[in-house]
């Protein structure tokens, strides 16, 4: 079945797709179709910030992906939670709001990506942002759709984390991790609006769905892009009511993320020719870079447990308090359930030669659960060390020409030896922090890696056994001007007209922070690139 043509067909109602659909449909004469493989984002575990652990591990909300066995991680398969729901991974993520470092974007521009320097992208960060606590309009937006705020009453353990950094010395406090100099330790902001997750689905898409020129198709999986005479003319969709074709008279906009955007390009004959031919897929455009340059932030946690009940968590001793917290959230959407748990962090340089923070220490004032129970059972805290600028690069490849078969994802985590060094330095620092007087009153015991892991060899063994990623995959449809680039600086796919990629897959290199806000920025800028509008002519703030 074929339906009437739309001007724009957007594949994926994730973080970028929701933004793009809302912006393009602002013109009431433009018909936009947004297609999502998952269902609506209506579950409580999505809305309630403290249930983030349940959301990100819920198979009904994700694609259920894992990586290929990782050579440098004892051949383990690493979970790869990617959202399969309206809002995409922005409906299951930790809600942390970071932009990365300004130098990251200047590096993009220096590589030939004109229009992507920090000065170029800052207006697009501001455009989407409604920062409740930061009203500096030179750096922050104050009337954008996405609410950004501090947790109103952080857990007391956060103060111990900050005091520990002060005690160790050599690091400075930072009161704005999204400002011009995001280095140091401090409390951090999240995308939470009055006690609820404020994803791009909630902030951008829900209000836009009132427009008659915007159509949302859910539980509809795009199986391929229609290519005629080197031009994208629409997409093929599989849904409960059968297959259909959705034509696009202007452009097809691929917002399926760093795993599924390259998968769809390759299924449509756009990618490495030898790989496509090996699966019997006719080649529409030979682009060797499709699926290459895939990378993510390697991450490793130190976990501690304690009898003290200050941390977030459930126990018999805190049952009355937990019932009060539940009532507080139900009545006022406040209290511990209104927190995303990730309330403080540090972005620091682990070596003297770094020109910007190269590791993040993310503090979690809750016991790390080895299971998927919605809230932490017991009490404790954890610090996750994140390598912000890994050298290792992996790839996404097709396992089959059948679009129902999951692609093969090999991030090559820590395959480059230099990627382990920042994590090792971070492990030593975390132990220093935990040994300061700030944490002494809590009498916490390290359970992972455990005090028996003393030497660097022991800690490297723990790294192989326990390291994973921060779930920030990017780069698999890289923007650039060289032969390995998949899209140009206007996000157009090379060699195919009327087709763009608009998501984290286009990042030339990963940014030094969480990737949700930068992906929103990419979509905001893409809307201007597509329509020819400029930021200054659309919105203030």
Q: Which ranges hold each PLM region?
A:
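N-terminal redox-cofactor-binding region of secreted/periplasmic oxidoreductases
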Residues: 1-541
């Amino acid at each position: 079945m074929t339906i009437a043509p739309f001007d724009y067909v957007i594949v994926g109602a994730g973080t970028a797709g929701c933004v793009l659909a809302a912006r393009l449909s602002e013109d009431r004469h433009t018909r936009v179709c947004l297609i999502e493989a998952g269902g609506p984002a209506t579950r409580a575990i999505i809305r309630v910030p403290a249930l983030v652990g349940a959301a990100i591990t819920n198979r009904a909300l994700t694609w259920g992906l894992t990586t290929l066995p990782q050579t440098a991680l004892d051949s383990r398969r690493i979970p790869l939670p990617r959202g399969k729901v309206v809002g995409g991974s922005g409906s299951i993520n930790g809600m942390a709001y970071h932009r990365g470092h300004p130098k990251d974007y200047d590096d993009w521009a220096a590589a030939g990506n004109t229009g992507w320097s920090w000065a170029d992208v800052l207006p697009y960060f501001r455009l989407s942002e409604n920062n409740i606590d930061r009203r500096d309009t030179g750096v922050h937006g104050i009337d954008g759709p996405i609410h950004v705020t501090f947790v109103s009453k952080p857990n007391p353990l956060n103060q111990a984390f900050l005091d520990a950094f002060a005690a160790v010395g050599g690091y400075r406090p930072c009161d704005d991790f999204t400002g011009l100099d995001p280095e140091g330790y401090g409390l951090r902001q999240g995308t939470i609006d009055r006690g609820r997750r404020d994803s791009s689905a909630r902030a951008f898409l829900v209000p836009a769905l009132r427009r008659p020129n915007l159509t949302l198709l859910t539980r509809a999986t795009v199986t391929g892009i229609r290519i005629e005479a080197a031009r994208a003319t629409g997409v093929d969709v599989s849904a409960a009511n059968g297959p259909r074709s959705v034509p696009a008279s202007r452009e097809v906009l691929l917002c399926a993320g760093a795993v599924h955007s390259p998968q769809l390009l390759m299924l449509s004959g756009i990618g490495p020719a030898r790989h496509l031919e090996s699966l019997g897929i006719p080649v529409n455009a030979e682009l060797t870079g499709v699926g290459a340059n895939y990378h993510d932030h390697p991450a490793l946690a130190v976990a501690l447990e304690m009898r003290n009940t200050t941390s977030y968590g459930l126990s018999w001793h805190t049952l009355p308090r937990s019932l009060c917290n539940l009532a507080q959230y139900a009545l006022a959407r406040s209290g511990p359930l209104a927190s995303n748990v990730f309330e403080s962090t540090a972005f620091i340089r682990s070596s003297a030669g770094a020109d910007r923070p190269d590791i993040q220490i993310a503090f979690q004032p809750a016991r790390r659960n080895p299971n998927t129970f919605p809230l932490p059972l017991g009490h404790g805290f954890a610090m996750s060390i994140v390598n912000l600028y890994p050298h290792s690069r992996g790839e996404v490849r097709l396992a089959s020409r059948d679009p129902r078969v999951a692609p093969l994802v090999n991030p090559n985590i820590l395959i480059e030896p230099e990627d382990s060094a920042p994590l090792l330095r971070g492990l030593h620092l975390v132990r220093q922090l935990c040994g300061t007087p700030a944490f002494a009153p809590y009498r916490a015991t390290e359970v992972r890696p455990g005090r028996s892991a003393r030497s660097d060899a022991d800690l490297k063994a723990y790294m192989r056994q326990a390291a994973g990623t921060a779930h920030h995959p990017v780069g698999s449809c890289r923007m650039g001007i060289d032969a390995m680039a998949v899209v140009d600086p206007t996000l157009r796919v090379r060699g195919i007209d009327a087709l763009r990629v608009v998501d984290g897959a286009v990042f030339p290199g990963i940014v030094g922070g969480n990737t949700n806000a930068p992906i929103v920025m990419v979509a905001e800028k893409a809307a201007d690139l597509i329509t020819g509008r400029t930021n200054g002519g659309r919105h203030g703030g």
